[in-house]
């Protein structure tokens, strides 16, 4: 339905329930505002949008007045302009006259409208606010409340976008101010330092502190790109000073398809690593005679020399000891195009499938489990659909607000605004638990028993979707027989979750359809990870929640391009597009496409298996691109010994990482801001990254380096651009068949499968039919973790990340704002356990397993249960992976990071 009205003599049609402001904007009529943003609730606070409405008494605020049929509006009446001028004059009586030095100069809405309405600073000056500038110690948000115009945008943004409610109004009348918490510092009030308030502030009252003094808005160019931290796929603009060539700040954009104006602290403030003085700037070759300089033990080399040595060594070991003696670590930090080239070199040049990347360490069990059950190992629904259309979220093993913050905050927003229900299954009491109707705090490693117990209750009450099961699935009877072995009482005995909570979870899932299931590494990083994933697929098929809006099985992937790296074949068992290396048809297809013979049909070694092979001497040479196994792999003492035993190691990275220190050759790559390419996010959305600045020194984009190495190995690679590589990917990868740069650059937002150039993409998988035909119910039994507590090792250790750091910390430890917010490693320990051991808050403690130990400060918290400790791998000295074990899921070969004794 629509309404018809007249604005400035022009006939306008607008959707029903539009405001005058929305109707005017849709018709191209600009009405001034200072407190309006389309993302937020309108409050009519600034009075700048007042308009004349025929028949109405007085001026009306366009942002809050509904557009109605037959309304006649004049936006530029004398009365309206005079009122706006008066508002601006009053604001200037209590506003600093410091535009010449203000950080917001050129990007200030007040300045814009003062200029537009030709308003001068008044000769008279009334009482003015006088608050200390920058007194709040936040390392990321510069607060100057002398410039605040009380628009309330920061208050509403924090509440409505972040659902965090840090900013609020205090006092009344002229003394009204905006404060954090109960007039506290931002950190005291619990601020997450996301900077959303800064993004919405129309003046200079809130500003990005790290950007202070880096250049005015007029001196910046904006380059649209995609974040290189997690796989949510947030897009933003890198602001580059046109004079210095340096990135000055990150600004959100409402056009971003996934995140809009929302960003997390890492995305907004964690990119100063780009210009770190620790960046690698030139190729390096090991030379123990070098004892001084930036990198003792290495000498600088030319690109020709370094590439020649790499190529010569890789060819030597291939020809001397066979293709299986060479391995390649590709990277989820790199682009689709670069991962494609890396696996192509491994297969077409070295003739081995020994190529893998960090998906093996985080979501390999997701790929294996979903491929078995559904035929496709990826998130089924789009982020917007799963968060906005679901009636219930079942979040298992995902600390969403810390690890995928934009999705986590979106969940909290829907819970508050729409009443979406939330069930959390997690051994820790994470932030989401505060908004949940039910927290299932299972013992680590008992997920299958928990989910089977829930499904027992669903079946016992006849709550399953029989029509869906009969029409779309198979193997139900075998599955049912297994599930009926897990009544809630038995599941409770195994998991530690009370039986009544298991029953309540089943009831909530049955009564609130569609429900969306989300999980992350709390589900996947187990020796039973693949079974965990298949059991969640069972649950959603049982309820008929797959292939429908608001439902689905939705793994939240880790690294920025872990989905894409899998898609383009950086896995040991599949070519691009998940075409199996053991299938003769696929082998022949890629031999023809790549112009080679003799591609291997033997499944290659995974990351952990390659490390093991290096340890035994079977793997001679290893090429590592933007991976850091000396921080991210389990059992780091074993990894260190393996790297030391390699005959040749080449590391291609942007920093001298812990792994690079073992290398024979180091090749300096370009980071995401220094090259073009594409990333694919967790919802299968392919998005562009774009070059904003030059790499430091003679560092080069990874795709260019790989082309040179392949050519030097005797297999010429010459692509004019990443777009040309993407065209080749499209030619051999059916799910990417219609992915083209010209489509992405035209603004198309494509989710695979995209089968041809006219295909619009696929927001929801398995609609009507599953990729494999019928969904496969699997029978999954409870299996205990490989390690359980003993008298000698009485604690269970689980692992993860914190909000302010990312994985091994190579980037975040080189970000000043992030290090200021989280400067050292912490271990979560229950207060009662700490009391028994005589440990106080903040004590440095040593955590020891059968394999090794690490040191971190104790954080005493009931977020963890008795007998459970939680640590991270962001800091070398406090890295839990000195203590974790390399016990592998037999199907996906993923290590069991989540349970160590």
Residue ranges and their predicted role:
Residues 510-615, 758, 768-772:
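A glycine-rich, hydrophobic/aromatic-adjacent loop/helix-cap motif
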Residues 556, 565-571, 722-817:
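Long, low-complexity segments enriched in small/aliphatic residues
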Residues 347, 602, 607, 611-619, ...:
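Hydrophobic alpha/beta core scaffold segments
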Residues 12-69:
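N-terminal cofactor/phosphate-binding cores enriched in small/glycine residues
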Residues 6, 69-75, 183, 434-442, ...:
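Short beta-alpha connecting loops at secondary-structure transitions
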Residues 695-698, 702-752, 814-828, 832-901:
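Long, contiguous, secondary-structure-rich segments that constitute the structural scaffold
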Residues 2-13, 17, 25, 53-55, ...:
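N-terminal export/assembly segments and adjacent metallocofactor-ligating motifs
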Residues 53-56, 428-431, 654-690:
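Flexible glycine/proline-rich, aromatic-decorated loop/lid segments
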């Amino acid at each position: 339905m629509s309404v018809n009205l007249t604005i400035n003599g022009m006939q306008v049609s607008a959707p029903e329930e539009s405001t005058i402001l929305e109707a005017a904007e849709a018709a191209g009529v600009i009405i001034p505002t200072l407190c309006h943003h389309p993302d937020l609730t309108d409050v009519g606070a600034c009075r700048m949008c007042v308009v004349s409405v025929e028949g109405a008494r007085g001026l009306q605020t366009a942002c809050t007045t509904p557009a109605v049929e037959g309304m006649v509006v004049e936006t530029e009446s004398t009365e309206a302009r005079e009122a706006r001028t008066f508002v601006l004059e009053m604001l200037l009586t209590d506003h600093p006259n410091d535009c010449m030095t203000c950080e917001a100069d050129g990007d200030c809405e007040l300045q814009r409208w003062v200029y537009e309405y030709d308003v001068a600073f008044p000769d008279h000056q009334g009482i003015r606010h006088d608050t200390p500038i920058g007194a709040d110690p936040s390392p990321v948000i510069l607060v100057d409340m002398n410039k605040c115009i009380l628009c309330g945008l920061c208050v509403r943004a924090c509440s409505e976008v972040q659902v965090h409610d840090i900013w609020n109004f205090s006092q009344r009348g002229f003394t009204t101010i905006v404060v954090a918490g109960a007039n506290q510092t931002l950190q005291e009030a619990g601020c997450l330092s996301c900077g959303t308030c800064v993004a919405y502030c129309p003046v200079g009252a809130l500003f990005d502190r790290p950007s202070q003094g880096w250049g005015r808005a007029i001196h910046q160019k904006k380059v649209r790109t995609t974040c290189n931290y997690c796989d949510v796929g947030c897009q933003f603009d890198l602001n580059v000073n046109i004079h210095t060539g340096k990135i000055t700040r990150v600004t959100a954009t409402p056009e971003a398809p996934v995140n809009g104006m929302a960003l997390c602290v890492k995305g907004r403030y964690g990119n100063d690593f780009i210009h770190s003085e620790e960046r690698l700037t030139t190729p390096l070759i090991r030379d123990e005679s070098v004892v001084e300089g930036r990198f003792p033990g290495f000498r600088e080399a030319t690109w020709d020399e370094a590439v020649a040595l790499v190529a010569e060594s890789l060819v030597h070991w291939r020809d001397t000891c066979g293709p299986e003696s060479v391995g390649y670590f590709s990277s989820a930090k790199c682009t689709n195009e670069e991962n494609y080239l890396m696996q192509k070199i491994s297969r077409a040049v070295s003739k081995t499938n020994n190529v893998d990347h960090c998906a093996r360490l985080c979501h390999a069990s997701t790929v294996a489990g979903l491929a078995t059950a559904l035929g496709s190992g990826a998130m089924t629904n789009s982020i917007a659909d799963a968060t906005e259309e679901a009636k219930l979220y079942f979040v298992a093993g995902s600390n969403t607000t810390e690890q995928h913050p934009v999705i986590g905050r979106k969940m909290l927003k829907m819970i508050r605004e729409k009443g979406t229900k939330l069930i959390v299954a997690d051994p820790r009491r994470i932030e989401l638990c505060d908004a949940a109707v039910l927290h299932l705090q299972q013992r680590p490693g008992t997920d299958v028993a928990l989910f089977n117990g829930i499904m027992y209750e669903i079946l016992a009450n006849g709550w399953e979707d029989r029509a869906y099961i009969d029409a779309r699935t198979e193997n139900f009877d075998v599955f049912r027989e297994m599930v009926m072995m897990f009544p809630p009482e038995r599941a409770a005995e195994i998991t530690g979750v009370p039986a009544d909570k298991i029953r309540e979870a089943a009831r909530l899932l049955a009564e609130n359809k569609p429900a969306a299931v989300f999980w992350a590494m709390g589900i996947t990083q187990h020796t039973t990870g693949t079974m965990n994933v298949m059991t969640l697929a069972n649950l959603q098929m049982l309820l008929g929640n797959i292939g429908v809006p608001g439902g689905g099985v939705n793994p939240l992937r880790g690294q920025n391009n872990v989905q894409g790296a899998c898609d383009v074949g950086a896995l040991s068992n599949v070519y691009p597009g998940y075409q199996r290396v053991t299938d003769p048809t696929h082998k022949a297809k890629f031999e023809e496409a790549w112009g080679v013979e003799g591609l291997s049909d033997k499944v290659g070694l995974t990351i952990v298996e390659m490390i093991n092979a290096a340890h035994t001497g079977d793997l001679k040479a290893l090429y590592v691109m933007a991976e850091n196994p000396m921080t991210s792999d389990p059992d780091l003492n074993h990894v260190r010994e393996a790297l030391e035993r390699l005959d040749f190691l080449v590391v291609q990275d942007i920093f001298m990482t812990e792994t690079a220190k073992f290398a024979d050759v180091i090749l300096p790559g370009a980071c995401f801001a220094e090259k073009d390419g594409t990333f694919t996010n967790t919802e299968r959305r392919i998005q562009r990254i774009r070059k904003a600045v030059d790499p430091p020194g003679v560092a080069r984009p990874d795709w260019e380096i790989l082309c040179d190495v392949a050519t030097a190995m005797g297999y010429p690679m010459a692509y004019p651009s990443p777009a040309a590589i993407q065209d080749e990917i499209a030619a051999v990868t059916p799910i990417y068949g219609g992915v083209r740069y010209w489509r992405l650059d035209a603004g198309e937002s494509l989710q695979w499968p995209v089968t041809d150039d006219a295909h619009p993409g696929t927001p929801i998988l398995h609609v009507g039919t599953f990729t494999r035909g019928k969904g496969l119910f699997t029978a999954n039994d409870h299996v205990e973790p490989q390690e359980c507590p003993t008298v000698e090792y009485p604690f269970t250790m689980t692992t993860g990340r914190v909000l302010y750091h990312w994985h091994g910390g190579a980037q975040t430890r080189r970000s000043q704002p992030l290090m200021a917010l989280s400067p050292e490693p912490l271990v979560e320990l229950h207060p009662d356990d700490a009391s028994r051991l005589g440990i106080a808050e903040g004590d440095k403690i040593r955590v020891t397993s059968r394999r090794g130990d690490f040191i971190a400060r104790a954080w005493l918290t009931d977020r963890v249960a008795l007998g459970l400790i939680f640590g991270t791998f962001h800091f070398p000295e406090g890295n839990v992976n000195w203590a974790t074990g390399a016990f592998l899921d037999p199907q996906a070969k993923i290590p069991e990071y989540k349970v160590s004794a």
